[in-house]
């Protein structure tokens, strides 16, 4: 009996060792197979591909990596990874396809938020409006990077002799653009870049409009941006060109005053450069309003005519840049500021063109740029 029990224990021991060795061999083989299916060289770079079930920790790591790469919502990131068997490179491509389709569905939604971006040098400036649906997305670094890149693109596209040129999205949409941002395609078109960002942020994103300004060899371009998340961006922009007659003029003083006038334009909202450039329709419309108001006074026709002319001067002070009270010193007006500057630099200084733009203006009525306040007939 004792012998039988000992023999049984020996046999069981042999069986246990055999099974253990077989299990180790299988485990080693499975590990090697998993390694081969997990690390596949591609163009000299090892890409992680999973041929077997992925652990929870590995899943979370892949979700985190793809989220960092794309800024896409977590649910979309996970869905693409699951669809692509946790292959992160394939999932990134799938995510982009999903995003483009989603962006197309959202393209009809109202996008009245966003940013203005300016790019400029001493003689030229370009400003673009990039819209989105919420101010939250307008604070997104990818959105801001795209807005800045589009302004630089517009500046580079500006032709010689174009002192003032409005443009729509069609000017830039098909142009190639090189984006140096880790979350965006490096080389693409402007339209594809806008669509890619729309897919990334989950909102309707669109390039709405832009303007280009330039000056002569003896002038300067100045700008001011209100509510700036970073330099060259904001919700309201003022730009102005100042022209001088003498090439020896000290332009530093002209630039300084130009920046102040650009800030004035943002604050005072002028519609026209000078009284002579007030459109006939605007002038007649204002006269009609003033006549109606004067008639209720019960005064004589002569008295009412004087009343209308007096109130018309007040209208000019409200909407004509040269007649407006200077926001930095309301005891003088812009015309006097320019006269004083001309004396200081020894050369006559005049305003060539100006622009005031605000994010979302006019969008509720029309997508055209009718909400833009520009330099009347000075265009």
Curated annotation (Swiss-Prot):
Subcellular localization(s) per the UniProt record: Mitochondrion
Gene Ontology biological process terms, A to Z: mitochondrial translational elongation
UniProt GO molecular function: translation elongation factor activity
Keyword Protein biosynthesis attributed: yes
Pfam families: EF_TS
Recorded GO CC terms: mitochondrion
Record's keyword terms, sorted: Elongation factor, Mitochondrion, Protein biosynthesis, Transit peptide
Organelle transit peptide residues: 1-33
Superkingdom of this protein's organism: Eukaryota
Family label: Belongs to the EF-Ts family.
HAMAP family found in the cross-reference section: EF_Ts
Known function: Associates with the EF-Tu.GDP complex and induces the exchange of GDP to GTP. It remains bound to the aminoacyl-tRNA.EF-Tu.GTP complex up to the GTP hydrolysis stage on the ribosome.
Protein's UniProt name: Elongation factor Ts, mitochondrial
The species this protein was found in: Zea mays
């Amino acid at each position: 009996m004792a012998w039988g029990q000992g023999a049984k224990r020996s046999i069981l021991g042999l069986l246990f060792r055999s099974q253990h060795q077989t299990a180790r061999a299988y485990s080693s083989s499975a590990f090697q197979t998993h390694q081969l299916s997990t690390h596949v060289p591609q163009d000299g770079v090892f890409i992680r591909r999973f041929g077997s079930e992925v652990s929870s920790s590995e899943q979370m790591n892949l979700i985190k990596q793809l989220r960092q790469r794309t800024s896409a919502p977590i649910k979309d990131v996970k869905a693409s990874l699951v669809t692509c068997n946790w292959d992160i490179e394939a999932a990134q491509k799938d995510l982009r396809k999903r995003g483009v389709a989603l962006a197309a569905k959202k393209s009809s939604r109202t996008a009245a938020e966003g940013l203005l971006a300016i790019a400029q040098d001493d003689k030229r400036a370009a400003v673009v409006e990039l819209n989105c649906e919420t101010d939250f997305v307008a604070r997104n670094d990818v959105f801001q990077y795209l807005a800045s890149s589009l302004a630089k693109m517009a500046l580079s596209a500006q032709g010689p002799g174009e002192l003032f040129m409005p443009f729509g999205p069609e000017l830039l949409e098909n142009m190639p653009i090189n984006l140096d941002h880790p979350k965006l395609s490096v080389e693409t078109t402007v339209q594809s870049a806008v669509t890619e960002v729309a897919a990334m942020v989950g909102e309707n994103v669109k390039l709405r409009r832009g303007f280009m300004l330039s000056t002569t060899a003896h002038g300067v371009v100045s700008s001011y941006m209100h509510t700036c998340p970073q330099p060259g961006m904001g919700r309201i922009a003022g730009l102005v060109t100042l022209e001088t007659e003498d090439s020896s003029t000290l332009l530093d003083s002209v630039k300084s005053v130009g920046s102040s006038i650009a800030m004035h334009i943002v604050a005072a909202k002028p519609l026209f450069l000078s009284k002579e450039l007030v459109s006939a329709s605007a002038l007649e419309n204002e006269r009609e309003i003033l006549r109606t108001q004067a008639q209720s006074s019960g005064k004589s026709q002569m008295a009412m005519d004087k009343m209308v002319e007096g109130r018309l001067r007040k209208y000019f002070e409200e909407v004509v840049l040269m007649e407006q009270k200077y926001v930095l010193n309301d005891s003088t007006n812009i015309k006097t500021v320019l006269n004083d500057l001309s004396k200081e630099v020894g050369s006559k200084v005049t305003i060539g063109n100006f622009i005031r733009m605000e994010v979302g203006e006019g969008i509720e009525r029309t997508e055209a740029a009718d909400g833009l306040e520009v330099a009347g007939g000075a265009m």
